[in-house]
A protein has these predicted regions:
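Conserved, well-structured interaction surfaces
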Residues: 40-48, 52-56, 78-160, 174-210, ...
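Long, intrinsically disordered, low-complexity segments
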Residues: 18-21, 103-106, 191, 216-219, ...
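Short coil/turn linking the two alpha-helices of tandem helical-hairpin repeats
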Residues: 155-164, 205, 238-247, 449-453
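Membrane-proximal, proline-rich intrinsically disordered regions
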Residues: 19-68, 90-94, 255, 338, ...
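Flexible, polar/acidic helix-loop-strand segments at domain edges
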Residues: 298, 354-436
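Bacterial Sec-dependent N-terminal signal peptides
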Residues: 1-28
Length: 576
């Protein structure tokens, strides 16, 4: 009943709110606003509605994930919309994202809430036993909403660069006249907003004691202080990166942005560690169906699906298994990134390296947790036969949807989910938005760029980048060698990028990391696949390079033509 009441309150009020994707504005119906203001539950429902706009990527492009527009993977079916990112069909008319629409709608809802629903007293409920707890939760909503608004602005700037900006409900005269605010100014605003609310928002929902309203679970998916600091830290990293940092490398302005990024990531890490957070032992538990409990030591913020499903598994479990489509297939390019456990180097750094050999033995343990390969057993765990990804095999080409790369995706798939018609099962999925592992890497990158080498320290930053980057490698059940001493800057930077690709694979980072580094032509102009052939009991391998289109205009998305038609003040991104 409570859930229905929340949803009803949400639908009642937002049926009359502005449609932000069109930047249009309509006044609230006063009766409906007043109706929602009567109860804690209905006002809370408005905030819950905004949380539902958080982004995830369990196959946003008809099963394809954004990773398949990068060198992480290739979608196994031709003609999917994901190909638009690299086949020349991308354009303002074919803008390939709902981010503009969804973010501006969410921002409008945030502005509406902050202007219309703060400062309430709920005096009719003063005599209930948990009035104090309900008011404590209610008074926190405004800080959650301010975080969410800043979060949506970050997503917009990351994708479009300069964007229209408003922190209030638009008047009729303001509609469709907004100009684009410089990206760096929006980043500055996000960081300032995070600083203003970080000590006001609830620090930790698991330590509320008597301030937990009756009937409520202490565990929530809501923003807390660490979430706010995570947004600040990631924003500072992006603001300092080449795509947004217009200062000459090595200049004072350049270093100031990297200093801010290092300081912000250090602040988050120290806050997390002070709260007892750490890297969990089992890498794969980060995306387990119960990650919200068994990975809570590392997870800072995530977006949990509202119900148990099996659609992601149907899209990505190997072709040849019942009701499975193959989907997003990891590339040989990604496989190459997993280093050898003995020595901590990529196979292609070996003196006797042969590009047509896969070097599966002795690899970084994260490889087998992320990627399914030929001969793997119990993938998924109800499959009783070894995978056959060689040409003509049971899970391979020429079957429709057979892996074009030689591999299948494991990460984010729940291995226990059964997709058969006779025994179908479902389970929970949580999209990782922020986790501690990312910020150790962010901090290492910022330190390296600010201090100039991976081994430098000072009084404020006593731990060098080289030690910080090794933390994800030293996870108990990963236990890869630390980064070595004595690497020059070029080699260290390449090794750092490789570590980031491996640790954060398929978590939605690669698409944006390569863009903020302005290295699109280097990484996204081709991918490698591995064609496998069987003869008797032996296998042979042939590396295949698949070319893709890259143009530097792709560092930012095009502004949708439909939005430009509504607002003549919107300028288009360069090249589009």
């Amino acid at each position: 009943m409570k859930l229905n009441k929340l949803i009803y309150g949400v639908l009642t009020i937002f049926a009359f709110s502005s449609c932000a994707d069109q930047m249009e504005y309509s006044e609230y119906n006063p009766y409906d606003a007043g109706y929602v203001k009567r109860t804690f539950y209905d006002v809370g429902g408005l905030v819950s509605n905004i949380y539902q706009s958080l982004d995830s990527d369990f196959g946003n492009y008809s099963g394809a994930i954004l990773g398949s527009a990068t060198d992480e993977s290739q979608y196994s079916y031709t003609g999917n919309a994901i190909e638009t990112f690299y086949n020349g069909a991308w354009s303002p008319v074919n803008a390939q994202s709902s981010m503009w629409t969804s973010c501006y709608k969410a921002i409008a809802n945030c502005n509406n809430y902050l202007e219309e629903f703060t400062g309430l007293t709920f005096s009719e409920y003063e005599q209930i036993s948990d009035y104090e707890a309900e008011m404590y939760r209610y008074n926190n909503y405004q800080y959650e909403v301010r975080f969410l608004r800043a979060y949506f602005y970050f997503n917009l700037v990351r994708q479009y660069g300069d964007v229209p900006f408003t922190d209030h409900v638009l008047s009729t005269s303001e509609v469709n006249t907004l100009t684009r605010k410089p990206a760096q100014e929006v980043f500055d605003w996000i960081i300032k907003e995070c600083d203003e609310i970080k000590d006001l928002i609830i620090p930790d929902y698991n330590n509320l004691g008597a301030l937990v309203p009756s009937g409520e679970s202490a565990e929530t998916g809501r923003a807390n202080k660490r979430t706010v600091l995570a947004l600040k830290a990631r924003t500072a990293l992006y603001a300092a990166s080449p795509l947004f940092n217009s200062h000459q490398e090595g200049s004072q302005g350049y270093k100031e942005l990297w200093y801010r990024a290092a300081k912000a990531n250090k602040e988050l890490i120290e806050t997390c560690e002070d709260a007892g957070m750490r890297l969990i032992d089992d890498y794969e538990n980060l995306w387990d169906a119960k990650s919200y409990s068994i990975a809570i030591d590392e997870l800072i913020f995530g977006c949990r699906a509202i119900r148990a499903t099996n659609s992601f598994e149907k899209y990505n479990f190997p072709v040849g298994l019942e009701n499975c489509r193959g989907g997003n297939c990891p590339t040989q390019t990604l496989v190459d990134a997993y280093e050898l456990k003995d020595g901590g180097e990529r196979p292609d750094k070996k003196a006797d390296y042969d590009k047509n050999k896969p070097y599966y033995e002795g690899r970084d343990p994260r490889f087998e947790k992320t990627i399914a390969k030929n001969g793997d057993t119990k993938w998924p765990n109800w499959n009783e036969t070894a995978l056959e990804t060689y040409q003509g095999g049971a899970n391979a080409e020429p079957l429709s949807g057979g892996t074009p790369t030689g591999y299948y995706l494991k990460k984010y798939c729940q291995t226990s989910i059964n997709t058969t018609t006779a025994k179908p099962t479902t389970d929970n999925h949580t999209w990782i938005i922020y986790r501690l592992g990312e910020f150790y890497l962010n901090y290492a990158e910022a330190l390296f760029k600010y201090l100039g080498t991976a081994y430098a320290t000072n009084n404020e930053f006593p731990i060098p980048a080289n030690e910080m980057v090794s933390k994800t490698r030293r996870r108990t059940k990963v236990n890869m060698p630390k980064f070595p001493a004595g690497l020059d800057n070029k080699l260290w930077w390449e090794k750092y990028q490789n570590e980031r690709m491996v640790e954060l694979a398929f978590e939605g980072h690669r698409f944006w990391d390569v863009r903020r580094w302005k290295e699109g032509d280097k990484h996204f102009s081709s991918i490698d696949a591995m064609k496998i052939y069987k003869s008797g009991d032996s296998y042979s391998y042939r590396r295949v390079t698949v070319n893709r289109q890259w143009d530097d205009k792709m560092y930012f998305f095009p502004i949708p033509q439909s939005e430009k038609a509504k607002n003549p003040n919107l300028t288009q991104n360069p090249g589009w």
